[in-house]
């Protein structure tokens, strides 16, 4: 358990797997979280939870999601699960409460705005646990792709498409980009013309 939850620089990393990308119609089927320190060292892994849904819900997914979630094993885990959205939210909030105070961490991950939209609708208490800011690794990836393609191309994800593996990938990807950010001179202010 955390010795002091107030005023820390810990980061909450999260990933969701969903039945699709439509935040009004689709649903969260898996959630995982990791807490790191500011230097991206893993402090704790939260519960990795498949959320119960009926077979009809899974069969209604598009082909990509059906194939991916069967291949990863998530399909069967969802069918076998007894965990509801409310239980997954409560377990995740309880875990986070041991490591970081509410409102202290931005929501961290890849394409995290999409996760935030799903959380707002289906797990609003958990969504409110985060600071309003996001630490979205995909923003850095998009900038690197345009400004430093060799840096962007130097990282390969595992692409397992499970929530926990995707959280780990996000942390590792930011570690990759951080190597190149050191070339900026740390805390040294940069001169900007204009």
From Swiss-Prot:
Chief subcellular location: cytoplasm
Record's keyword terms, sorted: Cytoplasm, Exonuclease, Hydrolase, Nuclease
Annotated compartments: Cytoplasm
Residue ranges occupied by any Exonuclease domain in the UniProt entry: 11-174
UniProt-listed Pfam families: RNase_T
SMART domains: EXOIII
UniProt-recorded Gene Ontology molecular function terms: 3'-5'-RNA exonuclease activity; nucleic acid binding
GO CC term, one of those recorded: cytoplasm
Active site, renumbered: 132
Its EC number(s): 3.1.15.-
Membrane as UniProt keyword: no
BP terms from Gene Ontology: DNA metabolic process
Known role: 3'-to-5' exoribonuclease specific for small oligoribonucleotides.
PANTHER family the record matches: OLIGORIBONUCLEASE, MITOCHONDRIAL
Family that this chain belongs to: Belongs to the oligoribonuclease family.
HAMAP family reported for this sequence: Oligoribonuclease (MF_00045)
Protein name: Oligoribonuclease
Species assigned in the record: Xanthomonas oryzae pv. oryzae (strain KACC10331 / KXO85)
Biological classification of the source: Bacteria, Pseudomonadati, Pseudomonadota, Gammaproteobacteria, Lysobacterales
Gene from which this protein is expressed: orn
């Amino acid at each position: 358990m955390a010795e002091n939850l107030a005023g820390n620089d810990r980061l909450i990393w999260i990933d969701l797997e969903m039945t699709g990308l439509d935040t009004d119609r689709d649903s969260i089927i898996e959630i995982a979280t990791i807490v790191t320190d500011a230097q991206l060292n893993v402090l704790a892994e939260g519960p990795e939870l498949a959320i119960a849904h009926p077979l009809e819900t899974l069969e209604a997914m598009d082909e990509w999601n059906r194939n991916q979630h069967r291949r990863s094993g998530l399909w069967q885990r969802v069918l076998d699960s007894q965990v509801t959205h409310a239980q997954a939210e409560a377990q995740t909030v309880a875990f986070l409460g041991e490591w970081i105070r509410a409102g202290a961490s931005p929501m961290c991950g890849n394409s995290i705005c999409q996760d935030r939209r799903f959380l707002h609708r289906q797990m609003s208490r958990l969504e409110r646990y985060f600071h309003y800011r996001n630490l979205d690794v995909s923003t850095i990836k998009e900038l690197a792709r345009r400004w430093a393609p060799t840096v962007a191309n130097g990282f390969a994800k595992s692409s397992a498409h499970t929530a926990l593996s995707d959280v780990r990938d996000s942390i590792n990807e930011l570690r990759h980009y951080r190597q190149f950010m050191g070339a900026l001179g740390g805390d040294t202010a940069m001169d900007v013309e204009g």
